């Protein structure tokens, strides 16, 4: 059996985005992972950066998930706020997510902003708030590789 990974879930937005956080929590728990934080924060770049800084110092969270407000509109600050803080980027995540979404949505998939990478040996994922997109991202990309990705961040003796 795979190890249980401590996961923080941050919903950026309001009650409309709350369902995306609930879905993330359910999928992570069903996969056997432990939810260390689960809360909603304002769509403000400075607050997102502050939460991210706090979570990267936490000993209980090895993976951090942001959802909601990842689009290209000016009111969607997650992608830029997190991307600026990453030590290493996992650009293939966004590419693969858009490819999977293209199969269902067509050209609208180019607007999807999936961001992933690491900060201080913690994985960070930014997922759109759309429930179908979360199901696809978690089921086909994140959950199958989460433990492997964390192992890549751990120095070998």
Predicted regions located by residue number:
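Non-catalytic beta/alpha edge segments that cap or flank active sites
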Residues: 1-157
